[in-house]
Amino acid sequence: MSIGVVHEQTITFEAGIRLESGRILAPITLVYELYGTMNADCSNVIMVEHAWTGDAHLAGKRREDDPKPGWWDAIVGPGRLLDTDRYCVLCSNVIGSCYGSTGPASINPRTGKRYNLSFPVITVRDMVRAQELLLDHLGIRRLLCVMGGSMGGMQALEWATQYPERVASVVALATTPRPSPQAISLNAVARWAIYNDPTWKKGEYKHNPKDGLALARGIGHITFLSDESMWQKFERRFSAKDGLFDFFGQFEVERYLNYNGYNFVDRFDANCFLYLAKALDLYDVAWGYESMTDAFSRITAPIQFFAFSSDWLYPPYQTEEMVTCLQGLGKEVEYHLIQSAYGHDAFLLEHETFTPMVRSLLERVAP
C-alpha cells in the first residue's frame, strides 16, 4: 500500500560541524522526510541513506498528480518491508548535494553568492556527522536500523563505526570498504568530461554545463548496469528512426545513455556531482584507524551485507573482505550474495531478493 503524499522538512544548524579537513562548515541546512510515526521513546526509527545522486524523497509522492514516487517506494509503507504502521522511516539529503541540503550550489551567507568551488571538500563521514545533528534535533537517541546501498551503504558503515551506541542494526547493500582504482578511474573520466566543457568555467557557471555533465552521467550509468542486463535490455538493436548507414545513427544503448545523460542535467548540479564523486573516491572505512580491523572492532550492532553477483562497480569480493574481517572479530554478521543480472543497481530494482532477510533482522531488534 502506498503512503501517499509526503512533504519534505528542513532544519538549519547555525553552528554547523567541523569537517574531516578541519574546516568549519556553518550554517548547515538539511532536508529530510519522515514516514510513519515515532513511538514515545523514538526507538522505532529506521534511517535510510541515499546513494550518490539520490535525495531525501525515499517514498510516496510530492503531490497527488506526481507521476513518479520516491526512489525506493517499493519497500516503504504499510505492510511493506519498512512497515510504516510499525516503524518510523527517516531519509535525509546529504550535505554536498543539490536537493536542499547545504552544498556547492547553496548560497554562502558570507558572500551572498553560490559556494561553487569555495565549498570545502567533504567526506562520507562528514555527511554522517551532519546527520547526527538531525537525530539530536528529532530526539532520536538510537536508530533501530540504518540501511543503505552504494554510497548509502558507506554511510551505514560510518554510523556503525563512528556512533556504535546510536545504532541497533545495520543493513549495507552493494557497497565497499573503499572504492577500487577502477572505480576511482571511472569517476576521474567523468570529472574530465565536466572540466573540459567550456561552459563549466571552473565552477563559476550561470547555467549547468550540460554536455559535460550528460557525458559524466552516461559514464556512471554504464557502471550501474552489467553486461548481462545490457544484453537483456538493448541487445544490439539499432534505433528505429536511424538508418543503418547513417553516420550519426545510434544503437539503442547509445540512445538510452544520451537520453538519461541529458535528463540528468535538468535535475542535478555539476559542482555537486563533482564534490560527491570526490567524497566517494576518498571513502575508506579505515580512515583514521590503523586498519579495517581496528575500525570494525568498534561495531556493536548486528550487520547484514548484501552483494550482487553482476555488480562490477563494487564487486562481491569487496563485501566479502568486510565480512571476513567482522567474522574474525567475532561480530554478529550475515552475508548474502544475490544472484542478479542487474549489476550495481540491483539493490534498487530487486528488493524482493533481500526483503525476507532484512525483515527477519528487524524482527529480532525491534522493541
Curated annotation (Swiss-Prot):
Disulfide bond in keyword set: no
Function: Transfers an acetyl group from acetyl-CoA to L-homoserine, forming acetyl-L-homoserine. In vitro, can also use propionyl-CoA or butiryl-CoA as acyl donor.
Top EC class of this enzyme: transferase
Active-site residue list: 150, 311, 344
Keyword annotations of the record: Acyltransferase, Amino-acid biosynthesis, Cytoplasm, Methionine biosynthesis, Transferase
InterPro entries per the UniProt record, alphabetical: AB_hydrolase_1, AB_hydrolase_fold, HAT_MetX-like
Gene Ontology biological process terms from the UniProt entry: homoserine metabolic process; methionine biosynthetic process
Family of the protein in this entry: Belongs to the AB hydrolase superfamily. MetX family.
HAMAP family per the UniProt record, alphabetical: MetX_acyltransf
This protein's GO CC annotations: cytoplasm
Enzymatic reactions: L-homoserine + acetyl-CoA = O-acetyl-L-homoserine + CoA
Record keyword Repeat present: no
Pfam assignment, any one: Abhydrolase_1
Pathway, per record: Amino-acid biosynthesis; L-methionine biosynthesis via de novo pathway; O-acetyl-L-homoserine from L-homoserine: step 1/1
Protein name: Homoserine O-acetyltransferase
Documented EC number(s): 2.3.1.31
Domain AB hydrolase-1: 44-350
Compartment(s) where it occurs, according to its Swiss-Prot or TrEMBL record: Cytoplasm
Gene3D superfamilies the record matches: 1.10.1740.110, alpha/beta hydrolase
Binding of substrate, residues: 217, 345
Assembly, per entry: Homodimer.
Predominant place of localization: cytoplasm
